[in-house]
Amino acid sequence: VWKHLRALAYQQHPYQWMTIGKELAHIEEAQLEDVKAFFKKHYNPQNAVVCVAGNCSFEEVVALAKKWFEPIPAGEKYIRNIAPEPAQTAARHLEVHADVPSDALYMAWHIAPRLDPSYYATDIITEIMGHGNASRLYQKLVKEQQLFSSIQCYHTGSVEAGLLVIDGKI
């Protein structure tokens, strides 16, 4: 479902593809040098974050970080230059027929990026609308109207413009 939903929601942005790639062929056809270049570009100290929790001092953490990470070459600074997804100006629909355990309905709307101040309102709305059996969607559409066997509302929480999703199993 997510493969179809992402491709429907995003026309230009890389979010239209799953993290592993657009098609399995991308992985199958990758050459060892391609994989090494990708690893070198994305998995280096210049692009890393280290989080430490526990019973240790700042000085201990710095000493251990220097011991284990300082010998690793920093790598080139990687700056993503991705154009934002153009505004969606019309509804997009897709109906998929497949041999699945239950029918489902997925609806999605574009939302602000995670660092936008309005993101927090979206987070609260999705909790009220579709998180758990006490949520408004569950009470109305599962309990009262019995249109769905389950329903939820959530957001993708993406760094760039994400999606608010409602999905229901029929």
Regions inferred by a protein language model and the residue ranges of each:
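Charge-rich, well-structured scaffold segments of protease-associated domains
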Residues: 1-77, 95, 113, 121, ...
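Short amphipathic alpha-helix segments
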Residues: 136-144
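His/Glu-based metal-binding/catalytic segments typifying zinc-dependent metallopeptidases
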Residues: 7, 77-136
